[in-house]
Curated annotation (Swiss-Prot):
One of its GO terms (cellular component) is protein-DNA complex. The gene is lexA1. Keywords: Autocatalytic cleavage, DNA damage, DNA repair, DNA replication, DNA-binding, Hydrolase, Repressor, SOS response, Transcription, Transcription regulation. HAMAP family: LexA (MF_00015). The keyword Transcription regulation applies. The record marks 86-87 as: Cleavage. It comes from the Bacteria. Represses a number of genes involved in the response to DNA damage (SOS response), including recA and lexA. In the presence of single-stranded DNA, RecA interacts with LexA causing an autocatalytic cleavage which disrupts the DNA-binding part of LexA, leading to derepression of the SOS regulon and eventually DNA repair. The keyword Chloroplast does not apply. This is LexA repressor 1. It comes from Geobacter sulfurreducens (strain ATCC 51573 / DSM 12127 / PCA).
């Protein structure tokens, strides 16, 4: 199947999650309301693209005439599990905001998305609003971009271990690193960032 644009991925993920929860597909108005698309014409254009690319088929003269095609082999809907700060640490948000469709080959068990807030990672081409694909793991190698909990608060930074201390380095020259020395704080690696996705709308 052809690759999807970010907005098409969002539409497909919402349809998939809606069907899983309700047992039937959403209407065009429900899709428009959830994704804040102005009017059903915009939704129709996204559905036409998804149908053309082989992800769904549509039935004429039916308000819920959407059927998914070939989902088990190619795509998976992952939760956007909240917000992580690319800046100063902040309390983690763990409510499921939405679902986002991604190629199954990119996913290992437990992988999830977090929405980026802040600009501390701009030199790594990670900006506010991006979706960070996070693979859960408790360890990291130097230079890995990680989601870490620092004294119970979440942050997204580049990881370095230096002798007996850990440095969480921003990719913004205007921001200082977070240094965790023995006995001065608690840090835990939540996962490694393995991909960045940027909605275009």
């Amino acid at each position: 199947m052809q690759e999807l644009a970010p907005r098409q991925q969002q539409v497909l993920a919402f349809i998939t999650g809606f069907i899983a929860e309700n047992g039937y597909p959403p209407t065009l108005r429900e899709i428009a309301a959830h994704l804040k698309i102005s009017g059903t014409l915009g939704v129709s254009k996204h559905l036409e693209a998804l149908e053309r690319k082989g992800y769904l088929r549509r039935e004429a003269n039916s308000s819920r005439g959407i059927a998914l095609v070939g989902r088990t082999d190619t795509a998976l809907s992952l939760p956007v599990a909240g917000v992580v700060r690319a800046g100063l640490p902040q309390p983690a948000v763990e409510d499921i905001e939405e679902y986002f469709a991604i190629d199954r080959s990119m996913v290992r068990g437990g992988t999830f998305f977090l929405r980026v807030k802040g600009d501390s990672m701009i030199n790594a081409a990670i900006v506010e609003g991006d979706l960070a694909l996070v693979r859960p793991q408790a360890t990291a190698e130097n230079r890995d971009i990680v989601v870490a909990m620092v004294d119970g608060e979440a942050t997204l930074k580049r990881f370095y271990r230096q002798r007996d201390q850990i440095r969480l380095q921003p990719e913004n020259p205007n921001m200082d690193p977070i240094i965790i020395r023995p006995g001065e704080g608690d840090v835990a690696i939540i996962g490694k960032v393995v991909g960045i996705y940027r909605p275009l709308e």
